[in-house]
Amino acid sequence: GFGSLFKFLAKKVAKTVAKQAAKQGAKYVANKHME
């Protein structure tokens, strides 16, 4: 049904957002160490 599709999409988006956040966090930490 529609509910399961929504759940699936929400999971996918959450995974992508987490990946992007991890990338940004790593960049931020690296920049802080460079200073």
Curated annotation (Swiss-Prot):
List GO molecular-function terms, semicolon-separated. Answer: toxin activity
Task: Name the UniProt key words of this record, in alphabetical order.
Answer: Amidation, Antibiotic, Antimicrobial, Cytolysis, Hemolysis, Neurotoxin, Secreted, Toxin
Taxonomically, the superkingdom here is Eukaryota
Query: InterPro entries of this UniProt entry?
Result: Cupiennin (IPR035164)
Query: Which positions carry Glutamic acid 1-amide?
Result: E35
Q: Does the keyword Secreted apply?
A: yes
- Subcellular localization: Secreted
GO CC terms for this protein? extracellular region
Q: Does the keyword Secreted apply?
A: yes
Task: Give GO terms for biological process.
Answer: defense response to bacterium; killing of cells of another organism
Expressing tissues: Expressed by the venom gland.
Function in brief? Has antimicrobial activity against B.subtilis, E.coli, E.faecalis, P.aeruginosa, and S.aureus. Has insecticidal and hemolytic activities. Probably acts by disturbing membrane function with its amphipathic structure.
Give the family per the record.
Answer: Belongs to the cationic peptide 04 (cupiennin) family. 01 subfamily.
Q: Under what name is this protein listed?
A: Cupiennin-1d
Q: Which organism is it from?
A: Cupiennius salei
